[in-house]
């Protein structure tokens, strides 16, 4: 099938730039959500692999690429991100309360997907999360686990007012560094670097506003008690959608403790740990990811 690009304007005024593959009349519908600091193009190969039997849509979430970029960080709170996804699902399925077959999400896209699955489970038949912490687990680990607190220190840099300028400096050197902990990885080809550069050149503050809007960040000092006082109601963390979690175990930002006790919030969750893969498992081991997604789609 041929990749298509389009803009989807939602009823509440937000426009999402989208990429899609697969026939419009395919028997299955799949939506794929990006993570920081990427963009929807990272799903192109995945969509091509699934397209023979599925209509796949990968939106750039608000704040990313050519999608609407509200200036106020408050516009990136979960209720607004979930509203975007609910409206996109309605536009994709042809009506409200019609579910998609599979929602696939990585990193910040996973944050949106966890919230949607908790608040509107009727819209998703199956969920696949890729290296994205459940909000309840993230709160617990940021509050109680020194290893995760240390691993998440980078968040404090992302919320700085000058973060966009700092990350854009020297041809986005700091952003490219997030993709390549020990030197440029083999998957980060010159063509892919050019795609990242083109997206980042359209603005970074929208993507950074996800971090600015979130209360889930490590304490800034022993006196910082914000996380101790934060309570997430069960209604926003309990997920009753069949869920598969794919997890690259060499993720230096998201430590393994984030998987502990996940079944308490997500009954029946299936967890596939992948040794030797990092946060960027979709790029590092695409064949393995494709197979897990095909399995999830076949189970619907």
Describe the role of every protein-language-model region.
Residues 1-31, 51-55, 93, 99, ...:
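Alpha/beta-hydrolase fold catalytic core
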Residues 2, 16, 22, 57, ...:
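Flexible "cap/lid" subdomain of the alpha/beta-hydrolase fold that forms the substrate-access gate
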Residues 21-69:
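Conserved HGGG/HGGXW glycine-rich cap/lid loop of the alpha/beta-hydrolase fold
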Residues 35, 77, 284-285:
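Active-site helix-initiating loop/hinge in glycosyltransferases
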Residues 42, 84, 206, 288, ...:
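Charged catalytic carboxylate motif
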Residues 44, 114-118, 290:
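Short, hydrophobic alpha-helix immediately C-terminal to the catalytic nucleophile
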Residues 51, 266-267:
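Short conserved AdoMet
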Residues 277-286, 290:
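Catalytic histidine-centered segment of alpha/beta-hydrolase-like enzymes
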């Amino acid at each position: 099938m041929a990749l298509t690009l389009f803009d989807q304007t939602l009823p509440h005024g937000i426009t999402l730039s989208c990429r899609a593959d697969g026939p419009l009349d395919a028997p299955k519908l799949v939506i794929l959500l990006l993570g920081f600091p990427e963009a929807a193009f990272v799903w192109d190969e995945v969509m091509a692999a699934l397209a023979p039997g599925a209509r796949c849509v990968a939106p750039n979430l608000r704040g990313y690429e050519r999608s609407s970029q509200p200036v106020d960080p408050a516009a990136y709170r979960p209720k607004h991100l979930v509203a975007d996804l609910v409206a996109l699902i309605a536009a994709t399925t042809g009506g409200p309360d019609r579910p998609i077959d599979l929602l696939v999400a990585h990193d910040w896209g996973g944050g949106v997907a966890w919230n949607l699955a908790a608040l509107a489970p009727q819209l998703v038949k199956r969920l696949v999360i890729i290296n994205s912490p459940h909000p309840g687990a993230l709160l617990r680990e940021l509050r109680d686990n020194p290893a995760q607190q240390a691993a998440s220190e980078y968040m404090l840099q992302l919320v700085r007012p000058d973060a966009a300028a700092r990350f854009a400096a020297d041809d986005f050197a700091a952003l490219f560094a997030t993709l390549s902990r020990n030197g440029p990885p083999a998957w980060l080809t010159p063509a892919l670097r050019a795609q990242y550069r083109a997206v980042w050149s359209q603005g970074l503050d929208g993507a950074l506003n996800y971090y600015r809007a979130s209360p889930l960040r490590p304490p800034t000092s022993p006196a910082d008690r914000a996380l101790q006082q934060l309570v997430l109601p069960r209604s926003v963390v309990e997920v009753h959608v069949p869920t598969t979690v794919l997890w690259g175990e060499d993720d230096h930002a998201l430590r393994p403790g984030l998987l502990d006790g996940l079944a308490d919030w997500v009954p029946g969750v299936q967890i596939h740990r992948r040794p030797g893969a990092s946060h960027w498992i979709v790029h590092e081991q695409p064949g393995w990811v494709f197979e897990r997604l095909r399995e999830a789609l076949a189970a619907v």
